Amino acid sequence: EWEVIVVEGRYDKNTLSQVVDAVIIETSGFGIFNDAEKRKLLQTMAEARGLIVLTDSDGAGFVIRNYIKGCVDPKLVKHAYIPDVYGKERRKSAPSREGKLGVEGMKPQVLLDALIRAGATFDDEENKKSAPRISKADMYAHGLSGREGSAEKRTQLIRQLGLPERLTADGLLDVLNATMSREEFLMLQV
C-alpha cells in the first residue's frame, strides 16, 4: 500500500489517480486552513499510513505544504516535489501567476519519479493478495451503503471513528482500507 498522497485540488487528484492506486486527499487549496475535519483526517491517515505531500511548486503550493508540516507530525510526512516546468495547463486560458505547471500539468512519469524520490513505499503484489481489502459488498452487507438507513449508519460509524462527517461512502471505504484490515472491519459494531 502507498502512503496517503495529499494534493491541492480535484484536477491534481484526477491526474494523479491515473498514475497511482493510492488514497488521495485534496486540501481544496487554502480551504484546508479553515477545515478542522480535513486536518483531523490528515492526522488520522498520517498515523495509519503516512502522508506524501505533493503540491504545486509555486508559492501557494509551498504555503500549503508548510501548513501541513505544522499540523501533522513531521515524522509521518514525506515531501514530493515536482520540477519547475513553465507553461499552462490545457484546461486553463492563461498560465498561473508564476507561469509554472502544477501537479495536474505534469507527465505521469514525472509524478511517479517525484513520489519515488520522496521515498514512497510500494507493497509487493504478494502482500496485496494475502490481505483482502474491504469491498463495497462488505459495506453493503454491513448496511453502510445501498440500503434504507445506510447514510445514518455511515454517519454513526464516521463519528465513532472520529472522521469528517462529509466523507462520502467511497471516501469512507478508502479510509477504512487505509486504517484497518478487512477482519477488523467485519468485527466492527455499527
Annotate each language-model stretch with its function.
Residues 32-33, 85-90, 174-175:
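A short acidic, often aromatic-flanked loop/helix-cap motif at beta-alpha or helix-coil junctions
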Residues 6-8, 46-60:
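Acidic beta-strand-to-loop metal/phosphate-binding motif
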Residues 11, 28-30, 56-58, 80-87:
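Short, ordered loop/turn segments at secondary-structure junctions
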Residues 23-26, 51-54, 78-79:
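Short hydrophobic alpha-helical runs that function as membrane-insertion/retention elements
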Residues 13, 61-65:
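Short, well-ordered alpha-helical microsegments
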Residues 113-116, 120-190:
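C-terminal, charge/polar-rich interaction regions
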Residues 3, 10-14, 18-48:
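Acidic, glycine-rich catalytic loops of TOPRIM or P-loop NTPase phosphate-binding modules used
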Residues 69-121:
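Long, charge-dense
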